[in-house]
């Protein structure tokens, strides 16, 4: 009986979505702050900055993308760390 109960508890824990979802800011530089939940398994946030004729442009989101030279990229691993 105890074994059956333990098995049910383990199966319940495994089947429930107990995974944590990272939250990252995703607003462009000129917009009000917004954030979103990242896809499951995505544990990083990024802040990407570059300059063009409009000035400094900032892009934020989930993940840690590859960037070209001349683009400043900061990646971090906590909620809303990419502001």
Curated annotation (Swiss-Prot):
Q: Keyword check for Transmembrane, yes or no.
A: no
CC per GO annotation: extracellular region
Q: Which UniProt keywords apply?
A: Acetylcholine receptor inhibiting toxin, Disulfide bond, Ion channel impairing toxin, Neurotoxin, Postsynaptic neurotoxin, Secreted, Signal, Toxin
- The disulfides recorded in the entry are 24-45, 38-62, 64-75, 76-81
Q: Where in the cell is it found?
A: Secreted
Location (main, coarse): secreted
* Pfam families, sorted: Toxin_cobra-type
Signal peptide feature range: 1-21
Q: Which residues form a coiled coil?
A: none
- For this protein, what is any one GO molecular function term? ion channel regulator activity
Domain of life of the organism in this record? Eukaryota
PROSITE patterns from the UniProt entry: SNAKE_TOXIN (PS00272)
Q: In which tissues is it expressed?
A: Expressed by the venom gland.
Q: What does this protein do?
A: Binds to muscle nicotinic acetylcholine receptor (nAChR) and inhibit acetylcholine from binding to the receptor, thereby impairing neuromuscular transmission.
Which family, according to UniProt? Belongs to the three-finger toxin family. Short-chain subfamily. Type I alpha-neurotoxin sub-subfamily.
User: What is this protein's name?
Assistant: Short neurotoxin B
């Amino acid at each position: 009986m105890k074994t059956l109960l333990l098995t049910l508890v383990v199966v319940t824990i495994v089947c429930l979505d107990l995974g944590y979802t990272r939250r990252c800011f995703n607003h462009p530089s000129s917009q009000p702050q917004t954030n979103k939940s990242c896809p499951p398994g995505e544990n990083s946030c990024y802040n990407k900055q570059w300059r063009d004729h409009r000035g400094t442009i900032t892009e934020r989101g989930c993940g840690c993308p590859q960037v070209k030279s001349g683009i400043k990229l900061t990646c971090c691993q906590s909620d809303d760390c990419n502001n």
